[in-house]
Amino acid sequence: MDTRAVDEITEQNERYGPEEIIRRCGSPLTSQAIGPKLAWLRRHEPEVYGSTSRWYMASSYLVHRLTGRYVLDHHSASQCTPLYDLAARAWIEERCDEIAPGLQWPELVWPSEVVGGVTRDAEVLTGIPAGTP
């Protein structure tokens, strides 16, 4: 388990309040949460962060490679404490801008949604027919 973002967890708990984080996001901050990880990257790897425009979970990366869409399902987004509002089912934009400025955020979709078809480029790489949902 990656525990490098311990300081960032402490800072975000102090900034937003642990009870408020749980109320709004549904879970406490842990070393697995996206917010502290992005803050750690920004602080400790500024060159890498500066050359980053998007972040991906494994599922969203695969969907992007196959369809060209930058999306994340709501279930996965619920692991993005303190950046995802569970009740509103939306990114908490002010926190996203504060913790990870300059990054694009994936469009939120439901796990059952068809978000696109396999592209021609992905067909060449995978053998999956273009247009396959």
Give the predicted meaning of each segment:
Residues M1-G35:
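Active-site phosphate-binding/coordination module
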Residues I22-P133:
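Gly/Ser/Thr-rich active-site cleft segment
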